[in-house]
Every structure is written in C-alpha cells, then in structure tokens.
C-alpha cells in the first residue's frame, strides 16, 4: 500500500506544471514513427519490384534466345530443302511460323537481321531502320549463325524471303501497316524475279500476308492486278500451293467489294489444285459457298460449307468455324430446314450464334413480329457478318411457315384472320400469299374467293410419297461423300515403292524354284553316301 501511495504521488508531481508556468515539450507524435516505417516498407517494396523486373527481364532474354535458336533451325531447314530438293523441310519451317511470330520483338529481329545478312548490306540497311536498336548490356546475346566462309556467301533467296516475312508479320502485329507495306512490296519484287521451286511454299505465305497488309490499309483493289499476274505465273509453273493461296486471296478480294459475278467467273474459269492443303481447301469451299448462296443455289451452298467445316482444323480456327456456321444456319433456314439445337450449344459457338438462335426461333414458329424484332436488334451485326442480304430473304420463309402452321391448325379460316395473324396490311395480301403457298406446294388447301376463306384439305400419309426415299438418299450420299473424301485425304506410298515388290506370280515361281533346288540338294546328299 505504501508503494502504491508513493507511486501516485510521483505521478501527481509529474502531472503538475513546472514553476514559472512553462510546460514540458510534448512527446514526439507517433506519425513520425509510422512514416519511417512506411518509408522502410516502401524501400523494401521497391527492392522487391526491382527484383521482379530483373527476373522478368532475365526470363525475356531466355525466351529471346530460344526464339533466335528456332529461327536458326528454320533457316537450316530451308537450306536443307534447297540442297536436297525436298519441299517437306520448307513445310516444317512454315508450320512453326505462327508460334514464332508470337514471340517476335525488336531485339530478336535486330539480332536476326544482323546475324544472317552478313554479305547483303543493302537489304540489311533497308530493314534495320524499321527496328529499334537494343541497348548494349553485359548479358547481351552474341548471335552469329554465319561465321567463316558462310558469312561471305550470299544468302539463299528462300532464307531472305523468310526473314523479310518475319519482319512483315511483326510490323503487322504491331499495327504499323505503312511500314509493313514497304517491306512487303520489296519482298514481292524480289520473289517475282525468282523461278525456284523451293521458293514456292515460302512465296505462298508471302502472298497471303501481302494481301493482309493491303486489307488492313483498305487498299485491296490496288493489289488485285498483282494477284492475277502471280496466279497466271503459278498456274504455268504448276505451283499448287501458290495457285491455291492466290485463288483464295482473289475470291476474298472480290467478296470484300461484293463483286459476286466476277468471283463466279473466276471460280468457273479456274481449277482449284487437288494437292492444296486442308486449310486452303476450307477457305475455298467457304468462299464458293458464299457465292452460291447469293446466287440462290442454296443446296450447293450448304454442301460446300459443310465440306468447309469438315476440312477446317478440329481444335483451332474458332473464328473461321463461327463464320461458316453463321452462313450455314441462314442457308439451312432458306432451304426450309431448322438447324440442330446442339449446334447452338457448343461452347465455342454459343455466344456468337445467339442472334442466329433467336432468328431460328422466329423462323421456326413463323412469328413475323419476332423476326422483325430480331432484325432491328441485331441488324448491324448481321451486316458485319455479311449475312444481312440473305436474312432479308428469310421474310418470305417466315410467312410461308406461318401459313403452314395456320393450315395445320385450322381446317377453315378467313383471309382477314390470316392477315391479322401474319401482320399483313390487308386480306388481299393474305390471299396472294396463300395462293403462292398453294402453288409452291407448301400447303394443301383451296381458296374460296367469294366468301373469303381458306379450306385446308385432309392430310395425306407422308410415307406414301417420295419424301422418305429422298431423305434416305440424301443421308446415304452424305455418308458416301465422307468415305470418298477420307480415302482421298489418306497418304499412300509412291508408285515407285511397288517396283521393288514382287507380284504374286513371281513369288510362286520363286517358291517353286526354291522347292526344286531343295529337292536337288537332298538328292545330291543321298548320292554322296555309299
């Protein structure tokens, strides 16, 4: 208790102000301590940020090293293709082009141009201004793929075209289309002067990206004459890959400006090479399907677009498959068929096909009001997809479907009620539409013009008609087409492979000779014994 009392007195003494009215200075504010702690924490976070930046830079340098080694390997494949006259090595290099193009940057291309263009100073000086010169660091990569005598040897045209193509792709991905156009024009000028079969595959890729550059610049009409000239040259040289690529580029060019007649003439006057790869075949079938759809050949359009989906890659090219599905759905609706609901439920297609799903529902039910609502809501999207013109034609199909639904529901109905249900202007319009539906075989009915009503006839047994037979024929033809296309897509050994193989008759003769020789040997062995 005494200790507690003394402690209280000491506390009271400390609480009293000092003599003279002066007070002790207040203790330092705790904010100063907090600011110091925050500063220390800030310096620590800055250190961590620097460490992360250094780690990121190190990983980027490693990725650049791998990319340069890949480019070096692709160049080696091109050189092997030229020396061995084997185009499959060029295909190996071009097959990795999408993966390589995603990893390109200023540093990689600067090192590649400096490393490969050792003897061709003019091309090197032309390409380097389009790239930013990297800063010299201690960890800078020394990339010298050509040393010794190879450094002074001229670069192969295939390798030079491949490296310039990488530059064009990089500038396109960077949205520097004007600069990409300059390099691509220079590349086309060099390719046009060459006549080398090993260059054909690389040139086909160059044509594709050359047209893409002009498409981004909205100058596709400028490049059309050049593509025609290269198509003539590729056809005369039997360059299948170049011919397929150029045909597709010209069709895309015509369809971009809605020149369907010129596109149809090009398709009819040219032959698409059978040796073309599946990707080019898929593009060609899609373009021809669009042409056939515009020209009212809906059955042929559906066939070609179904084949285009079959030729397309199964797990990639999602955008291409979405585009084909949009047009295919509209064509099937124009044919009077309703697309399968599972088609709209695929995860990769569900979102993009939603407007077309609503359109299909409107056509299936024959609801003209809902059809007009979908058209008003998604009209701009349909125009962007290039299907708006075909969808406008669906209005008559919607009306026909509505007439058929009314005919199935009512044995007799007045023309005024039909006009009201179909949202037509007058009963006379309904009379014309019903008369046309009867003439086209959409419904089985008769019109009483005096009393103004439609009398539906009794339904006949559909199995007594030819419709089931035609449906089975269509399915069987589809299966046979799949079988024939699968056989064509298979790889078979060359004909020279059979030269070294003996026929069945030759094999029998050889076996007979072996048996006779064995008998003679046995007789000789028997004679050798006394």
UniProtKB/Swiss-Prot annotation:
Lineage top rank: taxon: Eukaryota
Crosslink (Glycyl lysine isopeptide (Lys-Gly) (interchain with G-Cter in SUMO1)) position: 36
Chain intervals with Basic and acidic residues compositional bias: 1-16, 497-521
Keyword Nucleotide-binding on entry: no
Residues where Phosphoserine is found: 414, 426
Residues covered by region (Disordered): 1-65, 496-530
Bias-annotated ranges (Pro residues): 17-30
Cellular-component GO terms for this entry: cytosol; nucleoplasm; proteasome accessory complex; proteasome regulatory particle
One Pfam family named in its UniProt record: PCI
Biological processes annotated in GO: regulation of protein catabolic process
Keyword terms of this UniProt record: Isopeptide bond, Phosphoprotein, Proteasome, Tumor antigen, Ubl conjugation
Any one GO molecular function term: enzyme regulator activity
Gene3D superfamilies: 1.25.40.570, Tetratricopeptide repeat domain (1.25.40.10)
Residues covered by the PCI domain: 282-461
UniProt subunit comment: Component of the 19S proteasome regulatory particle complex. The 26S proteasome consists of a 20S core particle (CP) and two 19S regulatory subunits (RP). The regulatory particle is made of a lid composed of 9 subunits including PSMD3, a base containing 6 ATPases and few additional components. Interacts with UBQLN1 (via ubiquitin-like domain). Interacts with ERCC6.
Sequence similarity: Belongs to the proteasome subunit S3 family.
Function: Component of the 26S proteasome, a multiprotein complex involved in the ATP-dependent degradation of ubiquitinated proteins. This complex plays a key role in the maintenance of protein homeostasis by removing misfolded or damaged proteins, which could impair cellular functions, and by removing proteins whose functions are no longer required. Therefore, the proteasome participates in numerous cellular processes, including cell cycle progression, apoptosis, or DNA damage repair.
Name of this protein: 26S proteasome non-ATPase regulatory subunit 3
Species per Swiss-Prot/TrEMBL record: Mus musculus
The encoding gene: Psmd3
